[in-house]
From Swiss-Prot:
Keywords: Acetylation, Membrane, Peptide transport, Phosphoprotein, Protein transport, Transmembrane, Transmembrane helix, Transport, Vacuole. It comes from Arabidopsis thaliana (Mouse-ear cress). The lineage of its organism: Eukaryota, Viridiplantae, Streptophyta, Embryophyta, Tracheophyta. PANTHER family: OLIGOPEPTIDE TRANSPORTER-RELATED. This is Protein NRT1/ PTR FAMILY 8.3. The chain crosses the membrane at residues 91-111, 116-136, 154-174, 200-220, 228-248, 351-371, 387-407, 431-451, 472-492, 511-531, 556-576.
Length: 585
């Protein structure tokens, strides 16, 4: 019999090995050199300031264009209210559609870091083109002469909209990757880092709104009082700073490896399950095909536990007699792993939750369209200062800046006592609260418009279309409520689509979340078009005419409030039936 020391030695060595392992992140990430990342030297909050700085400056650049774009279209390109609003929402929709391109490239081939780097360059080129279109005399549209406003030339349109849609492409490559790349800096297998990651999403959105605050206040004033060349040039400079901030943090980052095309994997499950449509799924789920390794067959992805819904798709993981005899399991178009099948199941389960974001985004789109037009029909003077209507977006941003720390420091600890959830509310609960608050926002906007129209009628301003002498500050409540809705819904959505998505589809799922913004903007454009069509028949003014005093913008806001209410009811029904993802430990 050996000594006590000899018997204890293996246990000591095992403990040292375990301690050494915990020095490194265990979520499959690597450092810049491709080695397992040391927790002490990489990721976590050490890397986040560079990512948050990048996001803050990039959002300042984006909102520096988007926040007051409708004013440029109406005053410089001489477009009507409906045409300008449609152009804005279509462009914003495209900005949230192009993330699908960046997401597929990031998840399948380049990884999030290099995708951000590449599309940042495209973004900067677009910003530069837009600045030139507002600065170079030959590229600027002619000014109005009295009531006559000459149309912009085809070359001027091409330069302006070319730059605008290069920005849409550039931001599309960045959007689905930055929040996920930031969350990648926290090890999912470490309980402490998981809590920090939940906090990261709050401060990520906080950074977005710091950039938006500068844009919606200072930049809007510069654009309308010091010229659009300077007003577009400053955001271009900040886009350059965003790129610099991102690259400075490179040595500190943790990187997740691309896992191959998610679209191919989804297609393989569909094809394999169809090919085995006559095969019976065994009652014992352990008989379904899965690799024996700790990690899944998908690069950079943990295994996902089997679930009993969508059982038809399980046929793709049934090992046929032919495959069992040959021992050849390599053809993924005939046989898929349980993890691969579960990836598709997760996307299917997410769909009803995902769809709720479309109506919410249609409501959010009003901040840069109809809220601005409503403000232009009000008294924008504060003392001797002329306040640009788009600058009211500052109150939405201020609301977010107030609500984020309030939520993170006070609401979460309080909610934790009642819900038992470490982060206060689950992502689904948080999003549901945001949907309810969005209904209140549209109701507030409608009430302000009712008051404005009554005053216009009492003062005889209906025919002239002159701004009504009611302070634009009456709009503050609707902006402030919208900011609160954002903190609950958009941040909850960010976290939901990161946590619930398969490991190798996180950029794609972030892009799908952003796609709701695109569809929401397109839906807003569609609703505007339909409302205009149906309310202007028989020679009527319509709800949204160029003279808002003779229209009924309040009806439009009530319509959106009603749609939001229905959307909320459908969401709660779907959320009650949602099954959470379970990754194998």
């Amino acid at each position: 019999m050996g000594s006590i020391e000899e018997e204890a030695r293996p246990l000591i060595e095992e403990g040292l090995i375990l301690q050494e392992v915990k020095l490194y992140a265990e979520d499959g990430s690597v450092d810049f050199n491709g080695n397992p990342p040391l927790k002490e030297k990489t990721g976590n909050w050490k890397a986040c300031p560079f990512i948050l700085g990048n996001e803050c400056c990039e959002r300042l650049a984006y909102y520096g264009i988007a926040g007051n774009l409708i004013t440029y279209l109406t005053t410089k390109l001489h477009q009507g209210n409906v045409s300008a609003a449609t152009n804005v929402t279509t462009w914003q929709g495209t900005c949230y559609l192009t993330p699908l391109i960046g997401a597929v490239l990031a998840d399948a081939y380049w990884g999030r870091y290099w995708t951000i780097a590449c599309f940042s360059g495209i973004y900067f080129i677009g910003m530069s083109a837009l600045t030139l279109s507002a600065s170079v005399p030959a590229l600027k549209p002619a000014e109005c002469i009295g009531d006559f406003c000459p149309s912009a030339t085809p070359a001027q349109y091409a330069m302006f909209f070319g730059g605008l849609y290069l920005i849409a492409l550039g931001t599309g490559g960045i959007k689905p990757c930055v929040s996920s790349f930031g969350a990648d800096q926290f090890d999912d297998t470490d309980s402490r880092e998981r809590v920090r990651k939940a906090s990261f999403f709050n401060w990520f959105y906080f950074s977005i709104n710091i950039g938006a605050l500068v844009s919606s206040s200072l930049l809007v004033w510069i654009q309308e009082n010091r010229g659009w060349g300077l007003g577009f040039g400053i955001p271009t400079v900040f886009m350059g700073l965003a790129i610099a901030s991102f690259f400075f943090g490179t040595p500190l980052y943790r990187f997740q490896k691309p896992g191959g095309s998610p679209i191919t994997r989804i297609s393989q499950v569909v094809v394999a399950s169809f090919r085995k449509s006559s095969v019976k799924v065994p009652e014992d789920a352990t008989l379904l095909y899965e690799t024996q390794d700790k990690n899944s067959a998908i690069a950079g992805s943990r295994k996902i536990e089997h679930t009993d819904d969508c059982q038809y798709l399980d046929k793709a993981a049934v090992i046929s007699e032919e495959e069992s005899k040959s021992g050849d399991y390599s053809n993924s178009w005939r046989l898929c792993t349980v993890t691969q099948v579960e990836e598709l199941k997760i996307l299917i389960r997410m769909f009803p939750i995902w769809a709720s974001g479309i109506i919410f985004s249609a409501v959010y789109a009003q901040m840069s369209t109809m809220f601005v037009q409503q403000g232009r029909a009000m008294n924008c003077k504060i003392g001797s200062f002329q306040l640009p209507p788009a600058a009211l977006g500052t109150f939405d941003t201020a609301s977010v800046i107030i609500w984020v720390p309030l939520y993170d420091r006070f609401i979460v600890p309080l909610a934790r006592k009642f819900t038992g959830v470490d982060k206060g509310f689950t992502e689904i609960q948080r999003m549901g609260i945001g949907l309810f608050v969005s209904v209140l926002c549209m109701a507030a906007a409608a009430i302000v418009e009712i008051i404005r129209l009554h005053m216009a009628n009492d003062l005889g301003l209906v025919e002239s279309g002159a701004p009504v002498p009611i302070s634009v500050l009456w709009q503050i409540p609707q902006y402030f409520i919208l900011g609160a809705a954002e903190v609950f819904y958009f941040i909850g959505q960010l976290e939901f689509f990161y946590d619930q998505s398969p490991d190798a589809m996180r950029s794609l799922c972030s892009a799908l979340a952003l796609l709701t913004n695109a569809l929401g903007n397109y839906l807003s454009s569609l609703i505007l078009t339909l409302v205009t069509y149906f309310t202007t028949r028989n020679g009527q003014e319509g709800w949204i005419s160029d003279n808002l005093n003779s229209g009924h913008l309040d009806y439009f806001f009530w319509l959106l409030a009603g749609l939001s209410l229905v959307n909320m009811a459908v969401y709660f029904f779907s959320a009650a039936r949602y099954k959470q993802k379970k990754a194998s430990s």
